[in-house]
Amino acid sequence: MTNWITKINGSVVQHATDVHFILNGQAAESAEAVGFSVINYAPYQLRDAADEDVETRVTTLLSGVQPDDLLIVQWPMWQADARFEKIFIEKIRLIPRVKVAALLWEVMPWLMTDDLSDGTHPEMTKLRDFDLLLVGNPKLAVQLRDSGNIALPMLAIGLIDFKCQGLLKAKTDFKDLVFRDSNGTEEEMSYHGQTPFIAMADGGFGVVPAARSQYEAHTNSLELSKYLSMGLPVVIRANMAQAELVRLHNLGIVLDDLNAIDAVLADMTIMDYQEKLTAVGAWSEAVRSGYFVKRACLESIRILKLREVDYLAEI
């Protein structure tokens, strides 16, 4: 029995600049580290292809998958032609006793319309074809279950892994705010624009950009993971999906209104900041090492193959 994960292979530019391709590749790398094999595919140009041609291509991709295998599909698959995903799942289901999980990067109908009450879109129907959904966080899982009418088992991953390079810097001015949101106007913020994270992780807090839509408030923040990867505690709005995780593990400051940050920092001592730095340390290492995808992969085996379900699997 083999465990598989899909990986999209785009251009050099895409893998260097497109966040979806970057995260897809890093996830496949993490899965390989825990024993998964990779099914590689490309962003195919299929708009003018006949259904038979699409089926042939998909059949070739799945030629190594055998009965009783497990497959994690990174979803969506980033194909211009919707037939590819549909046929891909249909072909998998023809293989006896194969278990299929979706590593869900985006809920496309909600991303496009910001209508989180829409559970009837054809893309939502595709999600119901899986045996398990690996979703970003519990808030999104609840929304998918309640509004998306998805009754599948779901496992909340927790954080987006971000495999950055470089050594963590010693932290100096703990009242500095590292800010990458162009909407910010607070005087105490230090605006770094596109400065690489490794060059600006020398102290203070990383300000997680506010959610620009209802959908964003239900998804995992890549900026949060970037700050944690460099060892920075964060400032995050209370309405965001990962605010409770930050509060629970003392990874930063949770605020209803960013304007309250002056008062919070005025009352903070260097000892308070050091406690947050210490708390961030283990999470920084986890994000940098691909821990969250690795855990999701191993949990998928436990849930779907071993049929063990306990509190670790948020079903």
Language-model segments: which ranges?
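Nucleotide-sugar-dependent
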Residues: 194-229, 236-244
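A charged, aromatic-enriched C-terminal amphipathic alpha-helix characteristic of glycosyltransferases
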Residues: 258-263, 270-315
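Extended catalytic core of nucleotide-activated donor transferases of GT-like folds
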Residues: 48-129, 135-142
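Active-site donor-binding acidic/aromatic loop of nucleotide-activated sugar
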Residues: 186-196
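N-terminal pre-catalytic "stem/leader" segment of glycosyltransferase-like enzymes
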Residues: 1-81, 94-99, 313-314
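Short beta-strand->alpha-helix junction loop in the catalytic core
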Residues: 45-47, 139, 154-167, 183-184
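Acidic anion/phosphate-binding donor-loop and adjacent secondary structure
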Residues: 113-115, 156-178
